[in-house]
Amino acid sequence: MQNYIIGEVERLKRKYGTSNPYELIDALNIHLMTRSDLGTLKGFYYVSFRERYIVINDNLHERDMLLVAGHELGHDRLHQRLAKVAPLKDFMLYDMTSRAEYEANVFASELLIEDEAIAECIEEEMDYFQMCRVVGFKPQLVTFKLYGMMQRGYPINLPETPNSSFLNK
């Protein structure tokens, strides 16, 4: 499935000439809304009467909103049939126990972080947290990207999986 996800991300980037999730959401005619009354809910994706919607908590930091947009776009591309039954809600974005959440995280990491950016960090012998600062995303998303790159043959050694509850703090 990981190869399918990477292929889907690459197809979108090629077709629309961007990796910006907001631009892709617009190009794909998905309705994007922000709301301030979501509490701890980061965002959600749903389908209603054949219309697709992404809702993002606008109390999040700008970079986190970008991440949620990429994550929810992943649900659109990978899990539309699930969203027709019930909205896909994201309280804990980096949940490793749910297959749909895991796949949406892989999608977001592949969309938002370029292989070349990680490769440059590795070449410059940056440590993990320096790498996260350079690419501009939280360590958990970077870990998803690193796992994907490892599976594609990059010489990366990771000691552990992401903590699924870090956003609850």
Predicted regions and their residues:
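Active-site hotspot residues in diverse enzymes, especially metal/ion-binding acidic/histidine motifs
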Residues: M1-K169
